[in-house]
Amino acid sequence: MPAINAKRVYRIMRQNALLLERKPAVPPSKRAHTGRVAVKESNQRWCSDGFEFCCDNGERLRVTFALDCCDREALHWAVTTGGFNSETVQDVMLGAVERRFGNDLPSSPVEWLTDNGSCYRANETRQFARMLGLEPKNTAVRSPESNGIAESFVKTIKRDYISIMPKPDGLTAAKNLAEAFEHYNEWHPHSALGYRSPREYLRQRACNGLSDNRCLEI
């Protein structure tokens, strides 16, 4: 069988309009990540994201969480068998504010950093955030490193907890996930915190009455 001339085939297909339309190149983001996600003081910036995992019986659980970008504490989280939606995000927002401020609201806006998921961009989500004293901020499109603290947390939770905890079904997995979040906050060391856990770092800061910068030097 004679060899097929690919260039000739291409030329004939082009002449007869048989080629697929070329996908336009995606322009580079005008909001390229150039700064740091971490901040020097607690309650300046929180970040939020979501992830999912599968139980042994095939159930899929979807988790939404919020972290402080300074002390790394997991402020609040929610798990569901449904999709990522605005209602769940609002529950996490409210839980995070209650965790840090009780019945009060922040005295100055706390930046709420997320990706561009529809549950975060929804008008009702953004309006609710501002009611709670949060200022919604979205990362640059196609720039996951812009929410690197949340991305790193997902890897840690999946690697150090979810991969080894019993998860025969959704109910059992949710209970064990609650213990995982508690263990992370109390015991998981962070290099950025001088190899202390989030709550160990917070307790030491409160005990010494020092700023976050000074705590990092201890």
UniProtKB/Swiss-Prot annotation:
Gene Ontology biological process terms, A to Z: DNA integration; DNA recombination; transposition
Key word Transmembrane present: no
Ranges where the Integrase catalytic domain occurs: 23-206
Protein name: Putative transposase InsD for insertion element IS2E
Disulfide bonds: none
Annotated InterPro entries: Integrase_cat-core, RNaseH-like_sf, RNaseH_sf, Transpos_IS3
Alphabetical UniProt keywords: DNA recombination, DNA-binding, Transposable element, Transposition
Organism: Escherichia coli (strain K12)
Presence of the UniProt keyword Mitochondrion in the record: no
PROSITE patterns noted in UniProt: INTEGRASE
Function, as annotated: Involved in the transposition of the insertion sequence IS2.
Gene3D superfamilies assigned to the protein according to its UniProt record, in alphabetical order: Ribonuclease H-like superfamily/Ribonuclease H
GO molecular function: DNA binding
